[in-house]
C-alpha cells in the first residue's frame, strides 16, 4: 500500500510517466521506423533508465505496452511482409561503466557461482538479421522487428556474399534439421565510403553513417540494388535449433564456421571478470584498427545450460550484456536553432551546425530537446560547441566552448506559436518542460503522423497508405483528417499527382489503395482501437479491451474504473481511453468510420468451439507452431482470456523455449504448466484434455 505522501503525488507521478513513456516511444519510432534518430544512444538509454526507475518505484504504472516491456521496433509500421521468428530475438542490456559491468557479473556469480566462462566479442554497429536454414538450405531471412515478428528480407539477404545458400556438412558437425542463426549486417568502412562516393556522383544524398546505410541497403525493394552494395554479415548467436545441442556458445561458433557461416575472428574466452576487462580495454585502444564500426564489446555466459538457468527478461537475456565505449567528441559551429513539431504536438528545438566528422561520419544536426535543456547546456546561436556521438552513432550537443566567444553570439528564443499551424504554444500541464501545440485536430504536423499511424502494421495495416501517400492526400485537401480515409473514391484520388497517371487515369497504386481501404474495414476491433491513436493503447491493451467489451460503443460507454479493471489495461490506459472518447471530434472520427462501413464490433467465428470459456491462460517463452500473437488470438477465439502475468487466478501457463520468470511464478503458485503439445490439446478439447 502506498503512503499518504505517495497518494498525494500520484497525479504528478502519472503525468511524469506519461510524458517520459511518450518521449521514449517517439525516439524509438524515429530510430526503428524512420532510420533517422535525433538523439544519441546515451540520451536514449538515460531516458529509458529514468522510465524503468519510475516504474520500479510505482509498479502499477508498468503496462504491457510500456517501452520498458517492448523490444526494439515493436508497434511500428514496416515496409516488408511480417514474419514470425521461431524463437524470440531479444535486445541486449547495456553497461557504460566498470561498476555496471561488475554489478552484472555479480548477479551472474550469485546465481551460478564460479561455473561461468565469458565469451567476449565485438559489438558491431549494424542491423540485426535472423537466418533460418531447413535441412541445410536457406529458407528465410528477417530483421529483428519487435523481437517476435520481423520483416521478410530473404531475397535481399541472398545477395550478401557472406550468407550461404546451403550449409556445408562436416564430420564433426552434421547440418541440423532446423537452424535459426542470428547475426549483424554491416558495411566495411571502405565499402561505405565507396557507396557514398557513388551516391554523390549520381546526385543523391550520401548516408550519414554505416549503420544507416546498412539498414537502407537491406530494406531495398529491388534486390538488385542490395546486390550492388557490398554488405557483410557476422553471426553471433542461435535461435531455434533442431538436431544440434551445443554445450557452449564457443562450440556453436565452431559449428557455424564449419557449416560455412561467417563468425568474427575477434571472439575470445575469459575465465573471470578480470579477463573480460582486459578484452574491453584492449579493444578500447584498438577499435579503429577494425575495418568496420564497433561501439563496444558484448559479453556472454558461454555455457548454454547456464544461459537457460539465468533466463531472460521481456526484452533481454540475463546472461549477456553490451559494454559500450565512451563516445567520441568534436567541436563545430552552431549556425542556427530551429524547431520541429512532433506527432503529439511536442515542440523540439534542433541544432544546425557546420558539418563535422565525428567517429567516422559527418554530423550537421542534433536535437536540443526543449528550452530548459538549451538553458542548462548554456548554448547560444553562433557558439562553437562540443558534440559527441554516444556509441559512435548518434550526435548530441554537450555545451559551448565559452572561451571562443567573440560577442556575436545570440540567445535562442523559443517560439510562442506552432511552426506548422501558428497555434499558441504552451506546456500541457503546469511544470512540464516541453511545450506543445494544442491544435491536435488541425495541426498539419500532428495530422500527418496520425494518418500514417492509421495505416501502420499494428493499426489497420493498410498497404500503399504510407507516409508519402498520407502527405499527398492532405496537401491536395482530398481528406481533412483521418476520419475521411474510408470514404475515399477514385475521383478523390485522381485529385492527387501521386495517384494519377500522365494519361489522367488512376494509377495501379491508387487502385490498390482503394482495395486495401475496403479490406481494412473488416479488421478486428483491436486494430481499430490502435488506429484511433489513443495514447498508450497498443495491441496488447486493445486486444484486452476488445475481448472484454466486444464493441467500440461499449468501450466508449465504460467508466474509467471498469476499463482499469480489465487485465492488461490498468489506470493509466483507462484514463487515456476515457479522455479520448470525451473529445467531440474524436467521436466524429468514429462516426465517419462507422458510416463508411468500418466494423466496430468484435465478431467471433462461430465455427470455433469455445473450449476455453472462462479460463485465464498465460503464454511464456517461444512456441514452434505459434507466434505470441497467434497463441493469444487462439485463446481469445475459444472464449479464454490471454493474460500477461501469472496470478492465483491463472488456470494454465503455456511454456515454450526460454520461458523466464512467468514459469517460475507458475511453479511457485502451483499453476498447471503445459508444453506446446498440451496447449494444442487444450485448444481442441478444453480442460477435459487434462483429465
Swiss-Prot record:
<protein>
    <recommendedName>
        <fullName>DNA ligase A</fullName>
        <ecNumber>6.5.1.2</ecNumber>
    </recommendedName>
</protein>
<feature type="binding site">
    <location>
        <position position="437"/>
    </location>
    <ligand>
        <name>Zn(2+)</name>
    </ligand>
</feature>
<feature type="binding site">
    <location>
        <begin position="41"/>
        <end position="45"/>
    </location>
    <ligand>
        <name>NAD(+)</name>
    </ligand>
</feature>
<feature type="binding site">
    <location>
        <position position="184"/>
    </location>
    <ligand>
        <name>NAD(+)</name>
    </ligand>
</feature>
<keyword id="KW-0520">NAD</keyword>
<dbReference type="InterPro" id="IPR033136">
    <property type="entry name" value="DNA_ligase_CS"/>
</dbReference>
<dbReference type="Pfam" id="PF00533">
    <property type="entry name" value="BRCT"/>
</dbReference>
<feature type="binding site">
    <location>
        <position position="300"/>
    </location>
    <ligand>
        <name>NAD(+)</name>
    </ligand>
</feature>
<dbReference type="GO" id="GO:0006260">
    <property type="term" value="P:DNA replication"/>
</dbReference>
<dbReference type="GO" id="GO:0005829">
    <property type="term" value="C:cytosol"/>
</dbReference>
<dbReference type="InterPro" id="IPR001679">
    <property type="entry name" value="DNA_ligase"/>
</dbReference>
<keyword id="KW-0862">Zinc</keyword>
<feature type="binding site">
    <location>
        <position position="121"/>
    </location>
    <ligand>
        <name>NAD(+)</name>
    </ligand>
</feature>
<feature type="binding site">
    <location>
        <begin position="91"/>
        <end position="92"/>
    </location>
    <ligand>
        <name>NAD(+)</name>
    </ligand>
</feature>
<dbReference type="InterPro" id="IPR041663">
    <property type="entry name" value="DisA/LigA_HHH"/>
</dbReference>
<feature type="binding site">
    <location>
        <position position="324"/>
    </location>
    <ligand>
        <name>NAD(+)</name>
    </ligand>
</feature>
<keyword id="KW-0436">Ligase</keyword>
<dbReference type="Pfam" id="PF03119">
    <property type="entry name" value="DNA_ligase_ZBD"/>
</dbReference>
<dbReference type="Pfam" id="PF01653">
    <property type="entry name" value="DNA_ligase_aden"/>
</dbReference>
<keyword id="KW-0235">DNA replication</keyword>
<dbReference type="Pfam" id="PF22745">
    <property type="entry name" value="Nlig-Ia"/>
</dbReference>
<feature type="binding site">
    <location>
        <position position="443"/>
    </location>
    <ligand>
        <name>Zn(2+)</name>
    </ligand>
</feature>
<dbReference type="InterPro" id="IPR036420">
    <property type="entry name" value="BRCT_dom_sf"/>
</dbReference>
<dbReference type="InterPro" id="IPR013840">
    <property type="entry name" value="DNAligase_N"/>
</dbReference>
<feature type="binding site">
    <location>
        <position position="418"/>
    </location>
    <ligand>
        <name>Zn(2+)</name>
    </ligand>
</feature>
<dbReference type="InterPro" id="IPR013839">
    <property type="entry name" value="DNAligase_adenylation"/>
</dbReference>
<dbReference type="Pfam" id="PF03120">
    <property type="entry name" value="DNA_ligase_OB"/>
</dbReference>
<keyword id="KW-0234">DNA repair</keyword>
<feature type="domain" description="BRCT">
    <location>
        <begin position="607"/>
        <end position="691"/>
    </location>
</feature>
<dbReference type="GO" id="GO:0009274">
    <property type="term" value="C:peptidoglycan-based cell wall"/>
</dbReference>
<dbReference type="GO" id="GO:0005886">
    <property type="term" value="C:plasma membrane"/>
</dbReference>
<dbReference type="InterPro" id="IPR004150">
    <property type="entry name" value="NAD_DNA_ligase_OB"/>
</dbReference>
<keyword id="KW-0227">DNA damage</keyword>
<comment type="function">
    <text>DNA ligase that catalyzes the formation of phosphodiester linkages between 5'-phosphoryl and 3'-hydroxyl groups in double-stranded DNA using NAD as a coenzyme and as the energy source for the reaction. It is essential for DNA replication and repair of damaged DNA.</text>
</comment>
<feature type="binding site">
    <location>
        <position position="421"/>
    </location>
    <ligand>
        <name>Zn(2+)</name>
    </ligand>
</feature>
<feature type="binding site">
    <location>
        <position position="144"/>
    </location>
    <ligand>
        <name>NAD(+)</name>
    </ligand>
</feature>
<dbReference type="GO" id="GO:0003911">
    <property type="term" value="F:DNA ligase (NAD+) activity"/>
</dbReference>
<dbReference type="InterPro" id="IPR012340">
    <property type="entry name" value="NA-bd_OB-fold"/>
</dbReference>
<dbReference type="GO" id="GO:0000287">
    <property type="term" value="F:magnesium ion binding"/>
</dbReference>
<dbReference type="InterPro" id="IPR001357">
    <property type="entry name" value="BRCT_dom"/>
</dbReference>
<comment type="similarity">
    <text>Belongs to the NAD-dependent DNA ligase family. LigA subfamily.</text>
</comment>
<keyword id="KW-0460">Magnesium</keyword>
Amino acid at each position: 500500500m502506498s503512503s499518504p505522501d505517495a497518494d498525494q503525488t500520484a497525479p504528478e507521478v502519472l503525468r511524469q510517466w506519461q510524458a517520459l513513456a511518450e518521449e521514449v516511444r517517439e525516439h524509438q519510432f524515429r530510430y526503428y521506423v524512420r532510420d533517422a534518430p535525433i538523439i544519441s544512444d546515451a540520451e536514449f538509454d538515460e531516458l529509458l533508465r529514468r522510465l524503468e526507475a519510475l516504474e520500479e518505484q510505482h509498479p502499477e504504472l508498468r503496462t504491457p505496452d510500456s517501452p520498458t516491456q517492448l523490444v526494439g521496433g515493436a508497434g511500428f509500421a514496416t515496409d516488408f511482409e511480417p514474419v514470425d521468428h521461431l524463437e524470440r530475438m531479444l535486445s541486449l542490456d547495456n553497461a557504460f561503466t566498470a561498476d555496471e559491468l561488475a554489478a552484472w557479473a555479480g548477479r551472474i556469480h550469485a546465481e551460478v557461482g564460479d561455473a561461468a566462462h565469458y565469451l567476449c566479442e565485438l559489438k558491431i554497429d549494424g542491423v540485426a538479421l535472423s537466418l533460418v536454414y531447413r535441412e541445410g538450405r536457406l529458407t528465410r531471412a528477417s530483421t529483428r522487428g519487435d523481437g517476435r515478428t520481423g520483416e521478410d528480407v530473404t531475397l535481399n539477404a541472398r545477395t550478401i556474399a557472406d550468407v550461404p545458400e546451403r550449409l556445408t556438412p562436416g564430420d564433426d558437425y552434421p547440418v541440423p534439421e532446423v537452424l535459426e542463426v542470428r547475426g549483424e549486417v554491416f558495411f566495411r568502412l571502405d565499402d561505405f565510403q565507396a557507396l557514398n562516393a557513388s551516391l554523390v556522383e549520381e546526385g543523391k544524398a550520401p548516408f550519414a553513417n554505416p549503420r544507416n546505410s546498412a539498414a537502407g541497403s537491406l530494406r531495398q525493394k529491388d534486390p538488385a540494388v542490395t546486390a550492388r552494395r557490398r554488405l557483410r554479415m557476422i553471426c553471433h548467436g542461435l535461435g531455434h535449433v533442431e538436431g544440434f545441442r551445443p554445450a557452449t556458445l564457443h562450440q556453436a561458433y565452431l559449428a557455424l564456421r564449419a557449416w560455412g557461416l561467417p563468425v568474427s575472428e575477434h571472439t575470445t574466452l575469459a575465465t573471470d571478470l578480470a579477463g573480460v576487462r582486459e578484452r574491453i580495454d584492449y579493444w578500447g585502444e584498438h577499435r579503429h584498427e577494425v575495418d568496420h564500426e564497433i561501439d563496444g564489446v558484448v559479453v556472454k555466459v558461454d555455457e548454454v545450460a547456464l544461459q537457460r538457468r539465468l533466463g531472460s527478461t521481456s526484452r533481454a537475456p540475463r546472461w549477456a550484456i553490451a559494454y559500450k565505449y565512451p563516445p567520441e567528441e568534436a567541436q563545430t559551429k552552431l549556425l542556427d536553432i530551429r524547431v520541429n513539431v512532433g506527432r503529439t504536438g511536442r515542440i523540439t528545438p534542433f541544432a544546425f551546425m557546420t558539418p563535422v566528422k565525428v567517429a567516422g561520419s559527418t554530423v550537421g544536426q542534433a536535437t536540443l530537446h526543449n528550452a530548459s535543456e538549451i538553458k542548462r547546456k548554456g548554448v547560444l546561436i553562433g557558439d562553437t560547441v562540443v558534440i559527441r556521438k554516444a556509441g559512435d552513432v548518434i550526435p548530441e550537443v554537450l555545451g559551448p566552448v565559452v572561451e571562443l566567444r567573440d560577442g556575436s553570439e545570440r540567445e535562442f528564443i523559443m517560439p510562442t506559436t506552432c511552426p506548422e499551424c501558428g497555434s499558441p504554444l504552451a506546456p500541457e500541464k503546469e511544470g512540464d518542460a516541453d511545450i506543445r501545440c494544442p491544435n491536435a485536430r488541425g495541426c498539419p504536423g500532428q495530422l500527418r503522423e496520425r494518418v500514417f499511424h492509421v495505416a501502420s502494421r499494428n493499426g489497420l495495416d493498410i498497404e500503399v497508405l504510407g507516409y508519402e501517400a498520407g502527405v499527398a492526400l492532405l496537401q491536395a485537401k482530398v481528406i481533412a483528417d483521418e476520419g475521411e480515409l474510408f470514404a475515399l473514391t477514385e475521383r478523390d484520388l485522381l485529385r492527387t499527382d501521386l495517384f494519377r497517371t500522365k494519361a489522367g487515369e488512376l494509377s495501379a497504386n491508387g487502385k490498390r489503395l482503394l482495395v486495401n481501404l475496403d479490406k481494412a474495414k473488416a479488421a478486428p476491433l483491436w486494430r481499430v482501437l490502435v488506429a484511433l491513436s489513443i495514447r498508450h493503447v497498443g495491441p496488447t491493451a486493445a486486444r484486452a479491451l476488445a475481448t472484454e467489451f466486444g464493441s467500440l460503443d461499449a468501450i466508449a460507454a465504460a467508466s474509467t474504473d471498469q476499463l482499469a479493471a480489465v487485465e492488461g489495461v490498468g489506470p493509466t490506459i483507462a484514463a487515456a481511453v476515457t479522455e479520448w472518447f470525451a473529445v467531440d471530434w474524436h467521436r466524429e472520427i468514429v462516426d465517419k468510420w462507422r458510416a463508411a462501413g468500418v466494423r466496430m464490433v468484435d465478431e467471433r467465428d462461430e465455427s470455433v468451439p469455445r473450449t476455453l470459456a472462462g479460463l485465464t491462460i498465460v503464454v511464456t517463452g517461444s512456441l514452434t507452431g505459434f507466434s505470441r500473437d497467434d497463441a493469444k488470438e487462439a485463446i481469445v477465439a475459444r472464449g479464454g482470456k490471454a493474460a500477461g502475468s501469472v496470478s492465483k487466478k491463472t488456470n494454465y501457463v503455456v511454456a515454450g523455449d526460454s520461458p523466464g520468470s512467468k514459469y517460475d511464478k507458475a511453479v511457485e503458485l502451483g499453476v498447471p504448466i503445459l508444453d506446446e503439445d498440451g496447449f494444442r490439446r487444450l485448444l481442441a478439447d478444453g480442460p477435459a484434455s487434462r483429465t
